[in-house]
């Protein structure tokens, strides 16, 4: 008999999120130990396979065509180029290879090339993930046919705050794509960004949305905004570290089986803050020098920290 899924309320999550910090960490870490090896991390690598000139106006994004940033437009990479990057990622220790393209939605004519990329990366023994914008049911089915393991499509923030960050699409559009991905039988990677000007209440509503999905995301990336010059959020106030840890700990409690990925913003985090994030339940990171267009901690720096903490690669 299957276990009935709990439907969380705002008051439930407020009580978890806002409890004394030590109690929150204790509860999150106990759950983390129950469902995961607390001393192992999943390593993934993220590659931008088509960069810039995105028609969406996400206020945080360096790749939006609405803003003048440091990012230069680049066409879709060839299958050969992508596979070479995937080989290098595998040699660097990655187990999952994520491919991102700056589109509102992928053009149908690109689907055969994307399928070749998926098949080629899988042939190297890597898990595959893509983030290409919104997908139709048919497109999701094509990617599944090629063997795509995960599709990333973040909800970014709470439903209440969403239109303060993006105006070229609706929050419901995100949910529609997530439903198409799930219906195709592809695992879901879905999270958001802290530091968009949202309140704590927005973070709680964001977590509620994820946790109350019929099937919560298998992977939940938690990003700390990297402010980009030229975007509307270039001067956004950084979310303090304790708030980041509270968000990760609450996500771990609400979604105990999911991988919680500590993603963008690690370059600006101290070793101590990262250690707290891992203790709170984060058990996945991107390795490599770049996250799409922004810097990521260099491999040797990560290796040094993980050795200090006794964290090893997830088998």
From Swiss-Prot:
The gene is bioB. Binds 1 [4Fe-4S] cluster. The cluster is coordinated with 3 cysteines and an exchangeable S-adenosyl-L-methionine. One of its GO terms (molecular function) is 2 iron, 2 sulfur cluster binding. It catalyses: (4R,5S)-dethiobiotin + (sulfur carrier)-SH + 2 reduced [2Fe-2S]-[ferredoxin] + 2 S-adenosyl-L-methionine = (sulfur carrier)-H + biotin + 2 5'-deoxyadenosine + 2 L-methionine + 2 oxidized [2Fe-2S]-[ferredoxin]. Catalyzes the conversion of dethiobiotin (DTB) to biotin by the insertion of a sulfur atom into dethiobiotin via a radical-based mechanism. It comes from the Bacteria. Coiled coil: none annotated. [2Fe-2S] cluster binds at residues 98, 129, 189, 261. It is an enzyme of class 2 (transferase). Disulfide bonds: none annotated. Pathway: Cofactor biosynthesis; biotin biosynthesis; biotin from 7,8-diaminononanoate: step 2/2. InterPro entries: Aldolase_TIM, BATS_dom, Biotin_synth/BioAB, Biotin_synthase, Elp3/MiaA/NifB-like_rSAM, rSAM. Its cofactor is [4Fe-4S] cluster; [2Fe-2S] cluster. Homodimer. PANTHER family: BIOTIN SYNTHASE, BIOTIN SYNTHASE, MITOCHONDRIAL. Belongs to the radical SAM superfamily. Biotin synthase family. PROSITE patterns: RADICAL_SAM (PS51918). The lineage of its organism: Bacteria, Pseudomonadati, Pseudomonadota, Gammaproteobacteria, Legionellales. [4Fe-4S] cluster binds at residues 54, 58, 61. GO terms for biological process: biotin biosynthetic process. Keywords: 2Fe-2S, 4Fe-4S, Biotin biosynthesis, Iron, Iron-sulfur, Metal-binding, S-adenosyl-L-methionine, Transferase. This is Biotin synthase. Its EC number is 2.8.1.6. Residues 39-266 form the Radical SAM core domain.
